[in-house]
Amino acid sequence: KNLTNDTGNSSYIYRLPGVFGKWCKPNYNSVVATFCHNISHDLPIQVNDPSFELSLVYIDDVIEEFVKVIQGERGGEKVPSVQPEYKIKLGDLSTQIQNFKESRDSLITEKVGSGIVRKLYSTYLSYLSPAQFAYSIPSYGDERGMFAEMLKTKDSGQFSFFTAGPGITRGGHYHHSKTEKFLVVQGEARFGFRHVASGETHEIITTSKKLKIVETVPGWSHDITNIGTKDMIAMLWANEIFNPDNPDTITHKV
């Protein structure tokens, strides 16, 4: 205050809550850094009071605020704060970071696109060693080709891909409520459709040289045939995670 009064220079006083983000030293004075480091390296963590509420700000938001000061976007003597400031219980924090780790096995991603979960996930990944940058996923193969699930979401379905050799047809079923989007990324394919009530048929030809999304529609049986001379590769999104107890997949010839 005296500096501002005596010289006219601007001054800013920040009282920061817990700051988290990449490169923070673990097992020192940041619970986020400690949890991210220890959980990612299969080391134990200690939660004394799961109900204790933390106040946190993200390092990128701190830097953005400080840059505004340096560039003169704030004037006069102030006691500003960094926003957004997040509130999270200690138990919820440990559970969230543990879920990040487990998502590689379940393939079910957390909602990492916005808010504190986005920033915690980026922070968690920054504590992985290079040997942990990649992980394997299951694949399933038969005479038709192979199939692998890549990513599952809690509320927006799942992503997978499959292959088929020349002349191979996959599918031959319909769904009551499940919907799908197909994208052929290598080769050529013919999609066949038949309305299960009226018998109406339809056909779509796609190729990786001219990318096209093909949607399956409830009540229409469908199949996909590789009409090219090399293996076909197709991406597949379904609006729900596959449930073997309720697959919503009924065999029906196209």
Regions found by a protein language model. Give the residues of each.
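Short acidic-glycine-tyrosine-enriched beta hairpin
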Residues: H195-T225
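Mid/C-terminal beta-alpha module of Rossmann-like enzyme folds, strongest
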Residues: K68-S139
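A short glycine-rich, His/Asp/Glu-containing loop-to-beta-strand
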Residues: A131-G172
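Glycine- and acidic-residue-biased ligand/ion/polar-headgroup-sensing regions
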Residues: S177-V196
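Double-stranded beta-helix
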Residues: A197-E200, S221, T225-V254
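Substrate-positioning beta->alpha
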Residues: I13, C24-T34, S51-Q71, G91, ...
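Conserved beta-loop-beta element that borders a ligand/cofactor-binding pocket
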Residues: N2-W23, C36-H37, L43-F52
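A short beta-loop-beta micro-motif enriched in histidine and acidic residues
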Residues: S156, I168-K181, S208-K210
